UniProtKB/Swiss-Prot annotation:
SUPFAM superfamilies: Class II aaRS and biotin synthetases, GAD domain-like, Nucleic acid-binding proteins. Signal peptide: none annotated. Aspartyl-tRNA synthetase with relaxed tRNA specificity since it is able to aspartylate not only its cognate tRNA(Asp) but also tRNA(Asn). Reaction proceeds in two steps: L-aspartate is first activated by ATP to form Asp-AMP and then transferred to the acceptor end of tRNA(Asp/Asn). This is Aspartate--tRNA(Asp/Asn) ligase. It catalyses: tRNA(Asx) + L-aspartate + ATP = L-aspartyl-tRNA(Asx) + AMP + diphosphate. The lineage of its organism: Bacteria, Pseudomonadati, Pseudomonadota, Alphaproteobacteria, Hyphomicrobiales. Its EC number is 6.1.1.23. Belongs to the class-II aminoacyl-tRNA synthetase family. Type 1 subfamily. It comes from Methylobacterium sp. (strain 4-46). InterPro entries: Aa-tRNA-synt_II (IPR004364), aa-tRNA-synth_II (IPR006195), aa-tRNA-synth_II/BPL/LPL (IPR045864), Asp-tRNA-ligase_1 (IPR004524), Asp-tRNA-ligase_1_N (IPR047089), Asp/Asn-tRNA-synth_IIb (IPR002312), AspRS_core (IPR047090), GAD-like_sf (IPR004115). The keyword Ligase applies. GO terms for biological process: aspartyl-tRNA aminoacylation. Transmembrane segments: none annotated. Residues 199-202 are annotated as: Aspartate. Keywords: Aminoacyl-tRNA synthetase, ATP-binding, Cytoplasm, Ligase, Nucleotide-binding, Protein biosynthesis.
Length: 604
């Protein structure tokens, strides 16, 4: 017989009745029923009920056992008495009568129990993460994470991609978030950086002649934590392809993500073909470039309607005269809501920094729509009808309004859309709703510096005839601000899973792109000379994307916080409470690295 086990704690079935077996695991729960002890024994695979009574030689040893002790038991499998079966356990039809028990590891009084899935402060859970990971839900999340990563790898290989590993120690990047720096002992005064992403390496892999690259890549960024972003490090499904168009990237990536989500959706619906939504359309219809399409509400622009001479609502008219816009957010069925519903939304809007949300409730009078509400009297019937028609409203519906400069009005309308959809129960929660966001602007106007600057990714290829682009006059702001880039995001349930782009592989086009934004060739050479040098030696057209693995797992585990799907996460202050990181190092280590500390005055 094996030293520790012949079976796992999730393996025994009625077919094993009568067999003598050995199990090892943790005491999940110990129950004393007056001379009969029940021990629920747990391991990675499941739970088995074990029984011992005073007739067993193991009874005295079993009496000393406490929760989370690690034990080895020998015994005979028997059926549970009729009526005591547990249908919730795969092993619930049987139990093990203990004939021998050995304590393999005792446990002191625990700072948090494993049994019961009770809520505990996050600090306690992170400090004792190894205990937290014994609990069923978190344990299952981590196992699901591994299965999802296995599925991603398999699907990428089936798509003709090859897995690569790129360096972890690299050069500091002048762009993006703050780097984590690693001092070099061999090169005093110089530092490596942990990669924020393998961006340059994966492009260099394409320039090196490889065709389809992928990697489950660790990325390191010194940035603040959020619910959907872990501080310090995260993982992404890094993808790059040679000789591809934007459509080729979509066709390669979409089946991978759809397939993984269908595999692990547990009954939730998954978008069939991911809709492609231009950036400008997303900002108008949803007020954000990462729309949650589970919500059916569509924002419409009603600036023209409120510009009508017959409209006397001066709060909106003054906004329009100043160059602002008015956006309408439909609220189907809201006419049946009490006044408190509208008051709550107005109070919420004030909390967002807006003066409130104007609204109109539509009723039917004599076969025609008639509006009521605080601003209805300032809007004549024909304008009300035009607004209702544009927003797709009928009797019993309402419409809310957000007004201001375009970016501010769009943002408020987008947040109101989510709030209204949730409050009215319109958002279909049991689905994964994907979309691509495309046609991002290449440039934008920097109002603070009064100049043209890059809008998003400066290294993406402009969606413009190359010869025409090279001949652009940098002073032609109207043309330049209308140029779109081959950039795209993939969004699921309002969460951005990734940004991607067709890369700018032509040095002449890249130099022109930076020149338009006011950056001279010397800036490019100084900051990105290595990449430019490679591009000058024969670079293929290439593009890619990098969906976040942690966010994918978070969605599929239905968790609101990314720390619930990471094995050993840091807290929001980028501290590992369990391992005590970051920590001080010895003077000897600092001397070896030629580093002298200049710490801030903590008393100041």
């Amino acid at each position: 017989m094996h030293r520790y086990r012949t079976h796992t704690c999730g393996a025994l079935r009625p077919s094993d009745v009568g067999a003598t077996v050995r199990l090892s695991g943790w005491c999940h729960r110990v129950r004393d029923h007056g001379g009969v002890l029940f021990i629920d024994l747990r391991d990675h695979y499941g739970v088995t009920q074990c029984v011992v009574d005073a007739d067993s030689a193991a009874f005295r040893a079993a009496e000393a056992v406490r929760s989370e002790w690690v034990i080895r038991v020998d015994g005979r499998v028997r059926r549970r008495p009729e009526g005591t079966e547990n249908a919730d356990l795969p092993t619930g039809a049987v139990e093990l009568y203990i004939t021998d028990l050995e304590v393999l590891g005792q446990a002191v009084e625990l700072p948090m129990p494993v049994f019961g899935e009770l809520d505990y402060p996050e600090e306690t859970r992170l400090r004792y993460r190894f205990l937290d990971l014994r609990r069923e839900k978190l344990h299952a999340n981590i196992m699901k994470r591994g299965a999802i990563i296995d599925s991603l790898r398999r699907r990428m290989r089936e798509g003709g991609f090859f897995e690569f590993q790129t360096p972890i120690l690299t050069a500091s990047s002048p762009e993006g978030a703050r780097d984590f720096l690693v001092p070099s002992r061999l090169h005093p005064g110089k530092f490596y950086a942990l990669p924020q992403a393998p961006q340059q390496f994966k492009q260099l892999t394409m320039i090196a002649g490889f065709d389809r690259y992928f990697q489950i890549a660790p990325c390191f960024r010194d940035e603040d934590a959020r619910a959907d972003r872990s501080p310090g490090e995260f993982y992404q499904l890094d993808i790059e392809m040679s000789f591809v168009t934007q459509e080729d990237v979509f066709q390669a990536v979409e089946p991978v993500l759809r397939g993984v989500f269908e595999e692990f959706a547990e009954g939730w619906r998954v978008t069939g073909t991911f809709p492609r939504i231009p950036y400008a359309e997303a900002m108008l219809k949803y007020g954000v470039d990462k729309p949650d399409l589970r919500n059916p509400l569509i924002i419409v622009d009603v600036t023209q309607e409120f510009s009508a001479e017959a409209v006397t609502f001066n709060a909106f008219k003054s906004v329009i005269r100043a160059g602002g816009v008015v956006r309408a957010i439909p609220a189907p069925g809201a006419g049946a809501q009490p006044r408190s519903f509208f008051d709550r939304l107005n109070n919420w809007a004030r909390g967002e920094g807006a003066p409130g949300l104007g609204y109109i409730v539509f009723e039917e009078e004599g076969g025609v729509l008639s509006g009521r509400g605080p601003i209805a009297k300032f809007v004549p019937p024909e304008v009300q009808a035009a607004i209702a028609a544009k927003a797709g409203l009928k009797a019993g519906d309402a419409v809310f309004f957000a007004a201001g400069v375009e970016a501010k009005a769009a943002g408020l309308a987008g947040k109101a859309r989510i709030r209204i959809g949730d409050d009215l129960g319109l958002t279909d929660k049991d689905q994964f709703a994907f979309c691509w966001i495309t046609d991002f602007p290449m440039y934008e106007w920097n109002e603070d510096e009064k100049r043209i600057d890059f809008s998003h990714n400066p290294f993406s290829m402009p969606n413009y005839d190359h010869d025409g682009f090279l001949g652009l006059d940098p002073a032609d702001a109207e043309t330049i601000l209308g140029i779109k880039a081959f950039q795209y995001d993939i969004v699921c349930n309002g969460i951005e899973l990734s940004s991607g782009a067709i890369r700018n592989h032509r040095p002449d086009v890249m130099e022109k792109a930076f020149a338009i934004a006011g950056y001279g060739r010397e800036v490019l050479e100084q900051k990105f000379g290595g990449m430019l040098n490679a591009l000058r030696m024969g670079a293929p057209p290439h593009g890619g994307i990098a969906p976040g693995v942690d966010r994918i797992v978070m969605l599929l585990c239905h968790e609101p916080n990314i720390r619930e799907v990471v094995l050993f996460p840091m807290n929001q202050r980028a501290e590992d409470l369990m391992m005590g990181a970051p920590s001080e190092v010895t003077p000897k280590q600092l001397r070896e690295l030629h580093i002298r500390l200049n710490l801030p005055d903590r008393s100041a």
